[in-house]
From Swiss-Prot:
Top EC class for this record: hydrolase
Stretches the record annotates as Disordered: 450-496, 515-570, 590-617
Subcellular localization, as worded in the UniProt entry: Nucleus
Function (record text): May have a role in the processing of DNA double strand breaks (DSBs) prior to their repair by the non homologous end joining (NHEJ) pathway. Probably exhibits both exonuclease and endonuclease activity.
Name this polypeptide is given: Protein artemis
Disulfide bonds listed in the record: none
GO CC terms of this entry: nonhomologous end joining complex; nucleus
InterPro entries hit by this protein: DRMBL (IPR011084), RibonucZ/Hydroxyglut_hydro (IPR036866)
Compositionally biased intervals (Acidic residues): 454-466
Biased composition (Polar residues): 518-537
GO molecular function, one term: damaged DNA binding
Species the sequence originates in: Danio rerio
Length: 639
């Protein structure tokens, strides 16, 4: 017997299986099936009056429930207000408050309950969460896992609350035989009885007007016989059942009921009063489908038990057992569980203690928390001179060497002096010189070599040759030596297909006398090879002619035309190893004795800007040390 009050906490504007008292103010009604304990107030005068003046109130149910309801003339006034819904078909419903115009939208899905013909469960999805109302249901173990609309993709939906049928949620009804097992026991008893003679008759003592149609259809198919019932009105629009029932008394299987306030003869136990045509007495047995009686048994019994000389009890349940309810709740694992029925001999507190371990908080499953995806991160652009087909992009190796920082000349670190061209008022702007220092940025590359941008195009070679001609025009001074080795290296570079790195970054040693070394020390900086870092490049424009002060490793293989494209990436590696910094002083002393041909040549000597001060070796030494160690270098002006 249902004790559900009709309202759900999440959606209080909806009433289910209860149509009296506070439910009269509901915006919509839902009927799970047509059993009387779920139809209280459905034909009441107050609800009938409300429907007369309402334009929006509807009753939602299944198609079978609609036909069963309207087959009774007392519910005919609902005909214009019933909206049947398909099974397993989500439907959007607007709940409108006629007094204020407020609207609430929910999506409802009807799921098969297996209780009786037309019985359904209602799954509500809306702003207040997902809620399931089962009504009366009989589901076997594992049926919940086969219901598509209880799932979202591969997981069970996040169900906030379940209002569940707990008719037999009692350990004494731990396991109830399945309907198939009960049907098999009843069929065997009927077959053994009616096959004896045409005068052997079976009466199914069913207490409800409908709900046993499962028995009727299966027995009719098994024995090719129709079942006698009192009326066919409720089955007229259900052809799958109508073909197995009849009002003809001349049949061996009866399911007719005793009329109220009508006496019947004791000698004839059939409610319809049927007798044999020739007057021979009928041999009648009664079979009473029951569940509670079997639940009270302490010993294991068969599904059919003989009670007397001609009466039997057969186990047949319309409600799920304790094990089946537990399996259902354990699978969907709702946050809240509310019982719809208080079992005989139990209290609400008893049910609460039994249901508490099945709630999500206690069943061990974590609560589902929905989080936003978050902001997408942009990919970091990698600065590298390697080609797109470089193996470094395909494979990552953990380097055992100390991590080094990669610095580009044009983009990452450079110290450049911009000087205005000489003009009439050039003296007033002699001090308009600035150093531009780019912040050091560590690189993810750990390769221990120097990158160099080169061009092997024929057009570039022609341009280099054209620009080298005017540069060679001024005759060398008597104290300078011709750079024969430099010319030879340029010619051999173009002919070589796979040059070695040593040709690019190691300058050939030229031994000179002490006087030449002393003259060149004051005007030239240390080479990159000797200092393990690259010195700042100074660019000056004087008399509209550009001359470039370059390191010895670059001047060995790059022509004057290459100095115009110094914006290209020319990277060096700054090692953080302290051992390199310790050898800085020793290498500086060796630099005084080892000079390349390009450093000796006076063509690259630049006159100092008027008013400027030539950096002292001590200042440059400190600058080189900071660059080699990867420390930040503070830009300052040189006056």
């Amino acid at each position: 017997m249902s004790s559900f009050a009709g309202r759900m906490k999440e959606y209080p504007s909806i009433s289910l299986d209860r149509f009296d008292r506070e439910n009269l103010h509901a915006r919509a009604y839902f009927l799970s099936h047509c059993h009387k304990d779920h139809m209280k107030g459905l034909k009441g005068p107050l609800l009938k009056r409300k429907l007369k003046f309402s334009l929006t109130v509807k009753l939602y149910c299944s198609y079978v429930t609609k036909e069963l309801l309207l087959s009774n003339p007392r519910y005919a006034f609902w005909e214009d207000h019933i909206v049947p819904l398909e099974l397993d078909s989500p439907t959007s419903i607007s709940l409108i408050d006629e007094s204020t115009g407020e609207t609430e939208d929910v999506v409802v899905t009807l799921l098969s309950a297996g209780h009786c013909p037309g019985s359904v469960m209602f799954l509500f999805e809306g702003a207040k969460g997902t809620v399931l109302y089962t009504g009366d249901f009989r589901l076997a173990v594992g049926d919940a896992a086969r219901m598509e609309y209880l799932h979202s993709g591969d997981r069970v939906k996040d169900i906030q609350s379940v209002y569940i049928d707990t008719t037999f949620f009692d350990p004494k009804y731990y396991q109830i035989p399945s309907r198939e097992a009960c049907l098999a026991g009843i069929q065997q008893l009927v077959q053994d009885w009616i096959c004896q003679s045409p005068y052997h008759v079976v009466w199914l003592n069913c207490k409800a007007a409908y709900g046993y149609e499962y028995l009727f259809t299966n027995l009719g198919q098994e024995f090719n016989s129709q079942i006698h019932v009192n009326s066919l009105d409720m089955f007229k629009k259900m052809p799958e059942i109508l073909c197995h029932v009849t009002t003809n008394r001349a049949t061996q299987i009866h399911a007719c009921r005793h009329p109220k306030d009508e006496e019947f003869f004791r000698a004839n136990r059939l409610p319809c009063g049927s007798t044999a045509p020739d007057g021979i007495p009928l041999n009648i047995i009664s079979i009473k489908p029951s569940t509670i009686w079997f639940g009270e048994r302490t010993r294991k019994t068969s599904v059919v038990v003989k009670m007397g000389s001609s009466s039997y009890r057969a186990c047949f349940s319309f409600h799920s057992s304790y094990l089946e309810v537990k399996d259902f709740l354990s699978y969907i694992c709702p946050v809240n569980i509310y019982p719809n029925v208080i079992p005989l001999g139990k209290t609400v507190e008893d049910l609460t203690e039994l249901l508490k371990p099945l709630c999500r908080k206690h069943c061990g499953r974590e609560e589902i928390v929905y989080k936003p995806l978050g902001a997408l991160k942009r990919t970091r652009k990698r600065s590298t001179s390697e080609g797109s087909d470089s193996d470094g992009d395909l494979f990552e190796e953990v380097s055992t060497a100390p991590r080094r920082r990669k610095i580009t000349v044009s983009d990452l670190t450079t110290v450049a002096i911009r000087v205005r061209p000489h003009s009439a008022n050039a003296d007033s702007h002699d001090n308009d010189q600035t150093y531009s220092l780019i912040k050091l940025c560590p690189s993810a590359h750990t390769s221990n070599y120097m990158d160099c941008t080169e061009s092997n195009d024929d057009d570039d070679d022609e341009d280099d040759a054209a620009e080298q001609t005017p540069a060679a025009a001024p005759p060398p001074s008597s104290t300078e030596k011709p750079c024969s080795k430099h010319t030879h290296s340029d010619s051999s570079l173009t002919s070589s297909t796979q040059p070695c790195w040593e040709k690019f970054f190691k300058a050939e040693v030229v031994l000179t006398d002490e006087s030449e070394l002393e003259n060149s020390q004051n005007t030239q900086t240390l080479s990159t090879e000797n200092t393990a870092s690259q010195s700042p490049e100074l660019f000056q424009d004087e008399d509209e002619d550009s001359s470039v002060h370059m390191s010895s490793s670059q001047s060995t293989h790059i022509s004057d035309a290459g100095t115009e494209s110094l914006s290209q990436v020319d990277t060096i590696m700054v090692q953080e190893d302290h051992s390199k910094a310790c050898n800085l002083q020793h290498k500086t002393e060796e630099a005084a004795e080892l000079k390349s041909d390009s450093q000796v040549s006076s063509d690259f000597e630049l006159p100092p800007t008027p008013g400027s001060k030539v950096p002292q070796p001590e200042d440059l030494k400190e600058l080189y040390r900071k660059l080699a160690a990867g420390e930040d270098v503070v830009a300052r002006q040189i006056f």
